[in-house]
């Protein structure tokens, strides 16, 4: 299955959660499922399985992860002691593409994934082009010196967008040199809200 590249508004309305900032804005304006019935449409009663599937799909679309990758991340989370659902989201937050997004180097996770894949990002000074790379405490994530000359990255600094960007507590941003450091492990509450991780655990425990 390919990564979703269709209208983010439509899928956000179908899932009932904004999968990007744009999706959130569209959902706020039209908080009902897509289709001909419009605002009068009600979300259908769904089975327990349907609810579990919906929560899994929410997480997959928000973080931009394919089904096979998502299942591998879940299986890795199962090996940790404690709550599997919480560790699932901690692992999703530690993905390099997500960290690039959280640091404000990209406006969406899809764009962050592209920046990583195209070789614009380094981890501890070494070019890393694997979006699924799991960051560790103490690592420095930065834009490659060769890439900083590009108009896009110059505008990030000149516009003041990075200086205004609010990063989560587990990351420390240095806007001047387009770098950031992982200073702590993310917590479940640092991850995307509005997703019930317990239903995801139940989905894979069937």
From Swiss-Prot:
Q: Which GO terms describe its cellular component?
A: small ribosomal subunit
Please give the InterPro entries that the UniProt record associates with this protein. Answer: Ribosomal_uS4 (IPR022801), Ribosomal_uS4_bac-type (IPR005709), Ribosomal_uS4_CS (IPR018079), Ribosomal_uS4_N (IPR001912), S4_RNA-bd (IPR002942), S4_RNA-bd_sf (IPR036986)
Q: Which domain of life is it from?
A: Bacteria
CDD domains attached to this UniProt entry: S4
What one GO molecular function would you report for this record? rRNA binding
The S4 RNA-binding domain extends over 94-157
Alphabetical keyword list: Ribonucleoprotein, Ribosomal protein, RNA-binding, rRNA-binding
Gene Ontology process terms (BP): ribosomal small subunit biogenesis; translation
Assigned protein family: Belongs to the universal ribosomal protein uS4 family.
Q: How does it assemble?
A: Part of the 30S ribosomal subunit. Contacts protein S5. The interaction surface between S4 and S5 is involved in control of translational fidelity.
Recorded hits in PANTHER family, A to Z, give:
30S 40S RIBOSOMAL PROTEIN, SMALL RIBOSOMAL SUBUNIT PROTEIN US4M
HAMAP family from the entry?
Ribosomal_uS4_B (MF_01306_B)
Purpose: One of the primary rRNA binding proteins, it binds directly to 16S rRNA where it nucleates assembly of the body of the 30S subunit. With S5 and S12 plays an important role in translational accuracy.
List the protein's name: Small ribosomal subunit protein uS4
């Amino acid at each position: 299955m390919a990564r979703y590249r269709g209208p983010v508004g439509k899928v956000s309305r179908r899932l009932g959660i904004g999968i990007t900032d744009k999706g959130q804005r569209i959902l706020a304006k039209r908080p009902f499922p897509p289709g001909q019935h419009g605002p009068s449409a009600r979300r259908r009663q769904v089975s327990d399985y349907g609810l579990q599937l919906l929560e899994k799909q929410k997480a997959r679309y928000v973080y931009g992860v394919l089904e096979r990758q998502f299942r591998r991340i879940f299986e890795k989370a199962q090996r940790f002691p404690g709550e599997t659902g919480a560790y699932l989201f901690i692992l999703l937050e530690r993905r390099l593409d997500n960290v690039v997004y959280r640091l404000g180097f990209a406006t969406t996770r899809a764009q962050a994934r592209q920046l990583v894949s195209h070789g614009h990002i380094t981890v501890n000074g070494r070019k890393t082009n694997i979006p699924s790379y799991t960051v560790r405490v103490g690592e420095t994530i930065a834009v490659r010196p060769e890439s900083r000359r590009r108009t896009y990255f110059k505008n990030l600094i000149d516009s003041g967008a990075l200086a205004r960007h609010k990063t989560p507590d587990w990351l420390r941003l240095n806007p001047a040199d387009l770098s950031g450091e992982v200073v702590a492990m993310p917590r479940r509450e640092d991850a995307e809200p509005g997703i019930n991780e317990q239903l995801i655990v139940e989905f894979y425990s069937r």
